[in-house]
Structures are given as structure tokens and as C-alpha cells.
Regions:
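Acidic/polar-rich alpha-helix caps and helix-coil junctions
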Residues: 1-101, 125-301
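Eukaryotic alpha-helical solenoid repeat scaffolds
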Residues: 107, 111-112, 167-170
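Charged, low-cysteine interdomain linkers and short loop/connector segments
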Residues: 111, 118-119
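Short Lys/Arg-rich basic patches
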Residues: 120-124
Length: 301
């Protein structure tokens, strides 16, 4: 049903109807959704097909966020202002919603502590260079780190009101995700050269003082870094590592946890570690009560 709706709806989209396309479900947004959908279905050739519609001339670099150039010199307020703008080529679909996410993701419960920031953002990577995120990592309090991405805008109930609602503008689909989806699909199609090409395009915008002569990724470099003789296993790990760092604190990691049945492990400040196993039914959201009243069975718990 989802696939049928996707394909039929895609043919009906007319981008000319929108003065600000990125606030609407355009063809590019539909193609991005298709890459995510077919990745879950393991129809990898279709992932590559739809991703390539977004990069028709393989012009990946010009459509990725310029983290190691333009973004590098921005203040955190400027980053917050730019990350979710409709003029940012990397944003394919932006949606506003009432949320306190922007004020909470730098806090204790949702924060990135020193151990995790070292593991995800600061540890060595296959290029041999330093991720640019090191230089845009800010502290939100003791042992809480964040990268300025999605900012809050507060809408008052009236001009003179002291109360209102917090909103955020969320990038639901981005060119970075599309690129990673294509790279992952090419791993399983055993198109390792294509995987490496995408990762090199990405790395050229994410490595501090990037130099092709020093930081170019090769299949041999991947095997050596991940200590494997299996090109596919190494390439998949490289894709996952870059993707994890790219979307830190955005929630995109959840899709990978689902596809690869990875347990969720959360150390707590008090000491105990909380684990959500790969087969735990709590990993599936509960059916809303309204739907239950309509006769839809709830998910097991």
C-alpha cells in the first residue's frame, strides 16, 4: 500500500505550484522518501535509482552542507539560523512542529556526554583526518555537548502575551541522508567503487583542512582501518560511522538500529545502564488510544 501510494503520488507532484518548494512534498522529497523506503525493503537497485534523480549529474558536493568551509566560520547562533533554512540546498523537506526539542537536546537527558562525543565525533576515522564537527561542538553545561542545528522560535498567543508555543523547523529529508542511503545500497550491490566515491565526496566537506592527497578513502584504506578482508563489511561500517556522526542528536540513528537490530544501551548518571534489546516490543510505538477506540489492535507490550 505504501509503495502504491508513493509511486502513484509521485506522478502527480507539480513542483511549479510552490513558491518555497522546501516547505512542500516536492519530487525531490518524494525521491528522498523512496530511497529510505526501498532501503528498508532491501530493494537496493531502486535506492540507487531514486537517489541518482536527486544527484542527476552526480553533483553531490554542491548539495551537501558546507561544514568545513562556510559553516566552519559561523557562530553557534548563525549555525542555528542557517541549518534549517529553506535556502539551504541540503534541505529537501522542512516541516514545522510544536516542540521543545531545541531547548532539550542539549540537556542532561538528551545530551551528548564526553564519552559519547569522543566515540562518535572525535575518534579516528577512515580518512585519517579530523572531523570538522570537533570545531562546532559546544557545551550546554557540565558534560553536555551539542552541535547547533535545529533552533526554536517562540510564537506568542498575541502581540503582548507572555505565553505561547515553542516551534522548531525540522529537516525531514536531506541530501546527506539520500547520499548515505545510496552508499549503503551500493554496499549490498557490491558496487564498492561507487560507495567509495560517495564517501569521498562527503568527506571533502566534513574533514578539517581536507586534502585529497592525504584524506582520500580507498577500499584498501577501509580494509586496513576496520581490520577486515571483507570489502563489503568494511564499506558498510564506514558508511554507518559517517552517518552516525552526521546526524548526531537528530534521531536518524534509529533507522539503522531497526534495520540492523542493534540494541539501545543508555548509561545513566546514577550508574545503572538501561538496555532496549533488539527484539523488545517496546521498540515499536504504541497505537494511539483514538485508533484503539476504532477497533485497531494495539501493539504487544
Amino acid at each position: 500500500m505504501i509503495e502504491k501510494d508513493l509511486l502513484e503520488g509521485m506522478a502527480l507532484i507539480d513542483d511549479k505550484q510552490y513558491s518555497v518548494p522546501r516547505y512542500h512534498f516536492t519530487k525531490a522529497a518524494a525521491y528522498a522518501f523512496a530511497t529510505r523506503f526501498y532501503l528498508f525493503k532491501r530493494q537496493y537497485a531502486k535506492v540507487v535509482e531514486y537517489a541518482s534523480k536527486i544527484f542527476p549529474n552526480n553533483n553531490i558536493v554542491s548539495l551537501l552542507r558546507p561544514w568545513n568551509s562556510e559553516y566552519r566560520i559561523l557562530t553557534y547562533n548563525e549555525l542555528w539560523s542557517r541549518y534549517a533554512k529553506a535556502t539551504e540546498p541540503a534541505n529537501l523537506l522542512l516541516v514545522e512542529t510544536v516542540s521543545t526539542w531545541a531547548r532539550n537536546y542539549i540537556g542532561v537527558r538528551y545530551g551528548l556526554d564526553a564519552q559519547k562525543s569522543n566515540e562518535i565525533l572525535l575518534a579516528p576515522n577512515v580518512t585519517g583526518g579530523t572531523r570538522i564537527f570537533r570545531y562546532q561542538l559546544y557545551t550546554g553545561g557540565t558534560n553536555n555537548y551539542f552541535i547547533p542545528k535545529v533552533n526554536e522560535y517562540f510564537v506568542r498567543e498575541s502581540i503582548n502575551a507572555e505565553i505561547g508555543l515553542p516551534y522548531v523547523m525540522v529537516p525531514l529529508f536531506t541530501t546527506e541522508e539520500v547520499m548515505f542511503n545510496r552508499a549503503e545500497a551500493n554496499v549490498f550491490l557490491n558496487n564498492i567503487n561507487d560507495v567509495v566515491n560517495d564517501l569521498n565526496a562527503y568527506a571533502s566537506t566534513r574533514i578539517y583542512n581536507y586534502s585529497a592527497s592525504t584524506h582520500t578513502i580507498t577500499a584498501g584504506k577501509i580494509r586496513s582501518f576496520y581490520r577486515t578482508s571483507d570489502n563489503q563489511a568494511g564499506a558498510l561500517q564506514a558508511v554507518m560511522d559517517f552517518k552516525r556522526a552526521e546526524f548526531v542528536q537528530e534521531g536518524m540513528r534509529w533507522f539503522d538500529l531497526l534495520r540492523y537490530k542493534i540494541p539501545v544501551v543508555h548509561p545513566t548518571y546514577e550508574g545503572p545502564t538501561l538496555t532496549l534489546k533488539a527484539d523488545d516490543p517496546m521498540r515499536v510505538f504504541q497505537i494511539p488510544d483514538v485508533a484503539k477506540l476504532a477497533g485497531i489492535a494495539q501493539n504487544p507490550r
